[in-house]
Amino acid sequence: GPAGGRDADGAPRFDQPVAPGGYLWWYVDALSDCGNYGLTIIAFVGSVFSPYYRSALARGRGDPHNHCALNVALYGAKRRWTMTERSRRSMMRDAQRFVIGPSALHWDGQSLTIDVRETGVPLPFPVRGKVRVHPGALSSLHVPLDEHGRHRWGPIAPCARVEVAFDNPALRWQGHAYLDSNEGDEPIERAFREWD
């Protein structure tokens, strides 16, 4: 079956099981060709940065599907940040799609499309747009991050091109991107004191 949020050939895959208390995320980092704009997007099943997930884990209710989020950070002149957490009722995953509330990720066999329909924080500005990641090549490398192999990382597309088109805020650019995934079978803080 799928591992590390990927198929055996390295392509993103969104239907991988996630252990209670665990996590799985897909991470995109991009910089515009002009160097003036950037973005980071993280799609979480079991948001490791969520105080609500941590609290649920402490109460013995660590269902990662009740703590899904699309974290979007836009850098440059039109900065925005989103991190709305959504429950199992507001998400859907299959091999090619991960729907988180009104937003979604979709792998079409060639590129990853991220439809962003979120609201910013702390100011509730709309954040609406589309990001397309076109991998230069796919990697099937899968690396354990701790001595027991409970936490793993894999670069999906270390070198990729990106197209960014947002209506809110008004942004259009192209640039270089990086795509990877991380997964864990237990809470991240059990193996790590800090995360860079």
Identify the meaning behind each predicted range:
Residues G1-D196:
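Targeting-peptide/extracellular-domain and disordered-appendage signature
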